[in-house]
Amino acid sequence: MIIINSSTIFAFSDTHGHHRDFKVPEGADIIICAGDAVEDDLKGGEYDDFIEWFSALPAKWKIFVPGNHELSFEVGKGDEKEKMMAEKGITVLQDAVEDCDGVVIGSISGNSIIADEDIPKDLDILVTHMPPYGILDEEMGSLEILNFVLKSKPKYHLFGHIHATAGQEFQLGQTICRNISVTK
């Protein structure tokens, strides 16, 4: 758990459809899922089940950042999924920033090109599915994400995707980079 501005934040990723087997600690004001909640969201019921489970978690803010297994966000059906989540009180962050009662959370995709003037200077948490290049990435990280972290200097960068480095942290300048994958 992370505490910022008296808000308690819990984050995870990579449940791959096993979310009901996963224990979320009590007491979080903000719960973040950094993607790969399902194995294949195009199959139907698995995604709906995740939305039901995630929306029922006892936190004021629920943030979802799609991963590479949330294929519908890449094939043009993301608006429908995002609407379903919004109706259940879940905020989908993709290349966006959300102020969660004084905790500023942002997300970028691994191939975003963001102009320097558009980089937020007050970002508390950056959430991505992919890791930054060279940081707990098993040689699969994103150079764009690394550059964004170096320029924006968030307090935390939370990501998943790489199961082999699940739970590990790395200090990158002022930023604590943490792999929040729950699958090893």
What are these regions (language model features)?
Residues 14, 36, 62, 67, ...:
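Divalent metal-coordination and catalytic microenvironments
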Residues 16, 37-38, 68-70, 97, ...:
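Catalytic metal-binding/acid-base residues of hydrolase active sites
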Residues 101-148:
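Binuclear metal-dependent hydrolase catalytic cores centered on His/Asp/Glu-rich metal-binding motifs
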Residues 61-63, 84-86, 133-184:
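Conserved beta-sheet core of the metallophosphoesterase superfamily
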Residues 6-16, 102-111, 125-129, 176-181:
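Active-site-proximal beta-strand elements of phosphoester/diester hydrolases
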Residues 2-3, 94-102, 168-172:
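Short acidic-hydrophobic surface loop/beta-edge motif
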Residues 12-100:
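Core catalytic region of metal-dependent phosphoesterases/phosphodiesterases
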Residues 30, 124-125, 155-156:
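Short, Asp-centered acidic motifs that coordinate Mg2+ and/or phosphate
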